[in-house]
Amino acid sequence: MSDLFSLNKEKKNKIVYTNYSAKDIEVLDGLEPVRKRPGMYIGGTDSNAMHHLVSEVLDNAMDEAVAGFASIIMIKMHQDHSITIFDNGRGIPIDNHPKFPDKSALEVILTTLHSGSKFSNNVYHTSGGLHGVGISVVNALSKHFKIKVYKQGKLYSQSYSKGAKLTDLISAEASKRLRGTSINFTPDPEIFSEKLHFNPKKIYEIARSKAYLYRGVSIEWECEVEVPSDIPKKALINFPNGLKDYLSSKISLDNLVIPEIFSGNIESTVDDIKLEWAICWQNNDTSAFMQSYCNTVPTPQGGTHEQGLKSAILRGLKAYSEMIGNKKAANLTIEDILETASIVLSIFIVEPSFQGQTKEKLVSNGVSKLVENIIKDHFDHFLSSDKVLATHLLEHVIAIAEFRRNKKNERNISRKSVTQKLRLPGKLADCTRTSAEGTELFIVEGDSAGGSAKQARNRETQAVLPLWGKVLNVASSTLEKIINNQAIQDLEIALACGSLKNYKKENLRYEKIIIMTDADVDGAHIASLLMTFFFLRMPKLVEEGHLYLAKPPLYRLTQSNKIYYACDEEEKIKLTYKLSKASKAKIEVGRFKGLGEMMPAQLKETTMHPEKRSLLKVTLEDVQNVDKIVDDLMGKKPEKRFQFIYEQALVKMDQIINKLDI
């Protein structure tokens, strides 16, 4: 492979050994790690990552507001594409830091990772923010960064560039009525592209989202650059009724099933929780949505707070139906109830636990039951206070449930008739569910992997098909070879949907088709061959979103009788570092040779359990050119593959070099 990255065709077999000593070990000081690896701190260097800088500064201002110290926040986009964010809170401390007596606390916060007042509950009871690194990361990634602190009749200011101090802390007289913190910054084009600038609409939406999450805060918005017609140049963003106001602005009030929005705002000092929600039901599901937050941080993957809300609504409606003697609601599911519901949920708790670094899913223990009990109590009162309204809502969700069951019965009849006509492959371990909805087919290679998968599966919803023989590369094979290939025959029979022009989605026997191969290079090759089959023989199946790739682990790490898994070398290195920092106990690393080597329980836990696994959804971004792309990469002409690899290598070379630790 290394030959692809060199124009020199002369092969050199001589190995040159160099000294490797302490001087070769690189130690990064201060904010250097942020500038060298920005993706580790803000998730990348694209537009989303750049706008995350605004969210981070705004989160700090919001924390002052949530704690009750600020009531006004100002956001201004300037003509030079810089942005200023101000809050009238207490102002960042400017006295000398006890640990660094020659530096102000302000300078320590701006130049030191993992510094601030959010690591204890003494200053902020609840807070958002990113990874505990906060404003120092914004400073490190800004070409210009100027901070002003209004405190006790004084104005303190300081300037930075790329994380380095340009001026000492300057003090000047100011009005005693002024207090708070003002930050002006411009992202560094060396980190982000020079073509990237802040998007006014995106910043405005970020500001709106923060304002409705805390009803006591007003955000003053001003933009000097040109804005879209649907974004104001100046505005006072304020939602006095919080989430209820926000939900009302997002929906059509004329399209509601019931005229009332079920909302609440509860703060409990006993349970250390602040909870707010707003729910409405509409006459169709085209505009239904669910947004949830924890400490103003969006949680698009949900979590324990969403689980609590769903349980409360389901229990509440079922209890009401029992009270009025309506037996049709006995088999209601939460999917029926929320089919046409639009929901906004916000929770503030102490020391929340999130899944992953990007904080997209809340996993705090005890939150689900707490949220369920609070919302269930209020939902019971909501339903009992207006029985006409409650009965109408109940009839609406029962109608949805009956429609779902009727469709399921139709699919069952269709699927049974298809199944009865088929002679299914002998190696197929089919699932017991008769409808395609919620079912999965795992495609594995060989009996060894198939045996483990069959034991690990959920027999009701998960089928396993071990492929016999070599998986054919359909891009370089004749039609005769494709038709006569045993593995392809088994696959097409099991799917039952036909191929090419004969493809019929209504005959597809499974909702998800999951390619599950070994986590090594050989497994990736087999997965590529199978994807080639689907791209060329069943492109509609891919377009409709049925094809997935499983992510089995390649490594198993054991420390103090606890087992961890890593999908690749990079994840193994990160996990090893994390475990070694947390404990001095020995870490044992094992490498799986393949899926067949894994115990069924391990395979289920890591790769097949719907709530614990990770799946990659396969999509077609360029449908028109998919045949050409697949032919270049998988076809009969190796020179096309070489050309593709060579071109990609030239494009990526600088990035590869920058990622190497020497």
From Swiss-Prot:
Gene: parE
GO CC, one annotated term: chromosome
Function noted in UniProt: Topoisomerase IV is essential for chromosome segregation. It relaxes supercoiled DNA. Performs the decatenation events required during the replication of a circular DNA molecule.
Alphabetical UniProt keywords: ATP-binding, DNA-binding, Isomerase, Magnesium, Metal-binding, Nucleotide-binding, Topoisomerase
Swiss-Prot/TrEMBL site (Interaction with DNA) positions: K470, N473, H525, R641
Residues noted as binding Mg(2+) 1 in the record, renumbered to the chain: E445, D518
Protein residues bound to ATP: Y20, N60, D87, G129, L130, H131, G132, V133, G134, I135, K359
Residues of the Toprim domain: 439-553
GO BP terms in the entry: chromosome segregation; DNA topological change
Keyword Metal-binding: yes
Protein name from the UniProt record: DNA topoisomerase 4 subunit B
Complex and partners: Heterotetramer composed of ParC and ParE.
Cofactor note: Binds two Mg(2+) per subunit. The magnesium ions form salt bridges with both the protein and the DNA. Can also accept other divalent metal cations, such as Mn(2+) or Ca(2+).
Enzyme Commission (EC) number: 5.6.2.2
Binding site for Mg(2+) 2: D518, D520
CDD domains found in the cross-reference section: HATPase_GyrB-like, TopoII_Trans_DNA_gyrase
Cofactor: Mg(2+); Mn(2+); Ca(2+)
Keyword Oxidoreductase assigned: no
GO molecular function terms attached to this record: ATP binding; DNA binding; DNA topoisomerase type II (double strand cut, ATP-hydrolyzing) activity; metal ion binding
Species of provenance: Rickettsia prowazekii (strain Madrid E)
InterPro entries, per the entry: DNA_gyrase_B_C, HATPase_C_sf, Ribosomal_Su5_D2-typ_SF, Ribsml_uS5_D2-typ_fold_subgr, Topo_IIA, Topo_IIA-like_dom_sf, Topo_IIA_B, Topo_IIA_B_C
